[in-house]
């Protein structure tokens, strides 16, 4: 009986992790100038292409345009001709059953569910630091460093929702790590380490009159290198 309870608990936790804790980000692939969109938490996982809603890069006119990519072995590969790339990923709808188990089904598909969540993920990759690294780019959600990152030096991060600063947003390495909250100006401190850095933030959207889910969570991952 105890083993059964433990197994059920682990299944529920796994489902919850898949639904909420995962993020998307861009990192270098094995080929020169090629990058791959990663999805995961402590470990990365493959994903269906249908969940990858867009990959955009900033062109020479300062406009965001779609980036061509190849989907291979459950991941998207690209060679962006830009220093700034944005990724939008929708992880579907996950419902918590009365048993505690999480399943990838909508509220309509599982009417007995305690609640149903739509986890949405955004990624922003600064591939090379320039003036655009410190600007807003008309995104629903965005994290903007206020200066070029330096290893072991606190960095101010501006958090925007629909172009406006947001107070009380958690900013850190991940949801499992210590975090700082944004102040009334939408600024939180983050201390980069040498090399590749991930900056995580989480938002929640209010949902009303939706037949498929009760809530939407938004996780954001900003990545850059620091020396």
Curated annotation (Swiss-Prot):
Q: Which UniProt keywords apply?
A: Signal
Query: Its domain of life?
Result: Bacteria
> Which Pfam family would be a valid example here?
DUF4198
Write down the InterPro entries for this protein, in alphabetical order.
DUF4198
The reply on keyword Signal is: yes
Which region is the signal sequence? 1-21
Q: What is this protein called?
A: Uncharacterized protein HI_1624
């Amino acid at each position: 009986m105890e083993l059964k309870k433990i197994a059920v608990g682990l299944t529920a936790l796994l489902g919850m992790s898949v639904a909420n804790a995962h993020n998307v980000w861009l990192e270098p692939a094995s080929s020169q100038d090629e990058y791959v969109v990663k999805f995961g938490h402590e470990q990365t996982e493959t994903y269906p292409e249908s969940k990858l809603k867009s990959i955009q890069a900033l062109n020479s006119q300062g406009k965001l345009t779609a980036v061509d990519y190849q989907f291979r072995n459950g991941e998207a590969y690209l060679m962006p001709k830009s220093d700034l790339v944005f990724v939008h990923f929708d992880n579907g709808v996950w419902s918590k059953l009365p048993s505690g188990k999480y399943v990838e089904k909508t509220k309509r598909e599982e009417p007995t569910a305690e609640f149903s969540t739509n986890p949405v993920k955004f990624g922003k990759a600064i591939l090379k630091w320039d003036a655009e690294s410190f600007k807003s780019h008309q995104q629903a959600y965005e994290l903007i460093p206020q200066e070029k990152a330096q290893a072991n030096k606190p960095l101010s991060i501006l958090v925007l929702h629909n172009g406006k600063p947001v107070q009380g947003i958690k900013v850190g390495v991940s949801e499992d790590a210590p975090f700082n909250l944004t102040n009334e100006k939408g600024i939180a401190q983050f201390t980069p380490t040498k090399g590749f850095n991930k900056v995580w933030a989480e938002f929640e959207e209010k949902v009303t009159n939706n037949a498929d889910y009760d809530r939407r969570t938004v996780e954001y991952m900003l990545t850059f290198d620091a020396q």
